[in-house]
């Protein structure tokens, strides 16, 4: 009971599907192997392929992205208390400072094109997660960008970002 997610990481690459890894913490966990009565179980057939996703910076779709990843860390704090009944259980599981970050990998045709997208201004990033699902990160800034000094045919670079938040994950 009282399950909250501690960390979640969502990523996608060319020729792949969206992948997610989540860590949950709970106030009380009961371990069992029995299935819930009345529930139905089936393999999930709705994997979201890379070509069903998108990344937008503000209102502009970024068509030079080859890989993307975002992380949400709630940094949960486990708070036990001394008590006689159920002393092994946590009393509280509050959220602490939420950390929002991620990384985009780009393939640019020119340094000018890279400079336009990687300008040092605050922005919103929207990640399409298939269908009408999306994750929107507000008040983002580029955190770490390394642009090669020599220009080849294509300019490949990774751009890390951090967001102040909030983040909205919707399916509307």
Short names for language-model regions:
Residues 1-172:
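Signature of extracytoplasmic/envelope-associated structural regions
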């Amino acid at each position: 009971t009282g399950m909250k997610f501690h960390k979640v990481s969502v990523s996608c690459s060319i020729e792949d599907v969206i992948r997610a890894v989540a860590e949950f913490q709970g106030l009380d966990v009961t371990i069992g192997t029995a299935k819930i009565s009345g529930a139905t179980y089936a393999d999930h057939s709705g994997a979201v392929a890379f070509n069903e996703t998108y990344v937008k910076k503000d209102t502009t779709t970024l068509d030079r992205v080859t890989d993307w990843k975002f992380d949400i860390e709630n940094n949960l704090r486990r708070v036990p208390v001394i008590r006689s009944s159920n002393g092994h259980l946590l009393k509280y599981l509050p959220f602490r400072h939420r950390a929002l970050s991620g990384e985009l990998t780009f393939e640019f045709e020119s340094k000018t094109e890279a400079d336009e997208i990687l300008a040092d201004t605050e922005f919103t990033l929207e990640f399409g997660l298939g269908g009408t699902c999306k994750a929107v990160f507000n008040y983002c800034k580029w955190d770490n960008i390394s642009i090669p000094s020599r220009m080849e045919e294509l300019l490949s670079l990774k751009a890390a970002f951090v967001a102040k938040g909030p983040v909205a994950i919707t399916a509307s």
